[in-house]
Amino acid sequence: MASNQQSYKAGETRGKTQEKTGQAMGAMRDKAEEGKDKTSQTAQKAQQKAQETAQAAKDKTSQAAQTTQQKAQETAQAAKDKTSQAAQTTQQKAQETAQAAKDKTSQAAQTTQQKAHETTQSSKEKTSQAAQTAQEKARETKDKTGSYLSETGEAVKQKAQDAAQYTKETAQNAAQYTKETAEAGKDKTGGFLSQTGEHVKQMAMGAADAVKHTFGMATEEEDREHYPGTTTCTTQSTDPTRHTYEKEVRITGTIYEPSFFCFNNVMCLCFVISVVSLCL
């Protein structure tokens, strides 16, 4: 029985010892597990911190690189903008200079063209004015000449009729006188015919002078002797070819042309000459 108790006590002691050992082992395991957990947690924290530090460093490096790159880009863009702005400014100045030169050239051309036009217009106006003045002078000369000829035409015609009548009456008187003296008798023929011939000769010369005066063939002295009212005028005219010529006409009180009565005077002169020939 004693041995059973001893065995029971020994077993109880062993059980307690085992229990204590198990508790101690459990406690140690718990502590070891706790230490492991702490170590793992510490390692994780360290790793996390290392990762955070590395990420922070990486972020800082990336940010610095980005900042540097951005600054480089900004610097390059600023330089590019400045270069482009300088090029645009240079191009704009060149365009403005070219436009100014073009404007000056165009203005100078317009001024030259305007001056040429004004000079041409002035010359044209002067030429037109000179032509108009010449035309007016020619018209005035023509009007004066036409009026003068119109006024003198009737006087010329009247003078021609008077001269023709004078020549006709002179010839008739000579014929009548010759006829009357021829009937006076044959015994007085010699002396009478001599006187008659002289008288007829004088009348014929008077008729001839009248005809010469009519034709404008008499001299100025003869005109003044037989026709005291006779004057001599000189007319000057200019033809279209600018050749100037003078025409001298002897008139009795006015200008006339002999063509109006040329035929009658010639007939009267022939009649007088025939009578003189018969008497002589």
UniProtKB/Swiss-Prot annotation:
Keyword Phosphoprotein part of the UniProt annotation: no
Composition bias, Basic and acidic residues: 28-39, 115-127, 136-145
Keywords: Repeat
Coiled coil region boundaries: none
Keyword Repeat: yes
Ranges annotated as biased composition (Low complexity): 40-114, 230-239
Gene3D superfamilies assigned to the protein according to its UniProt record, in alphabetical order: 6.10.140.1430, Helix hairpin bin
Intervals holding LEA 11-mer repeat repeats: 31-41, 53-63, 75-85, 97-107, 119-129
Location of region: Disordered: 1-156, 220-241
Induction: By abscisic acid (ABA).
Similarity field: Belongs to the LEA type 4 family.
Known function: Lea proteins are late embryonic proteins abundant in higher plant seed embryos.
Protein name, entry field: Late embryogenesis abundant protein 76
Lineage: Eukaryota, Viridiplantae, Streptophyta, Embryophyta, Tracheophyta
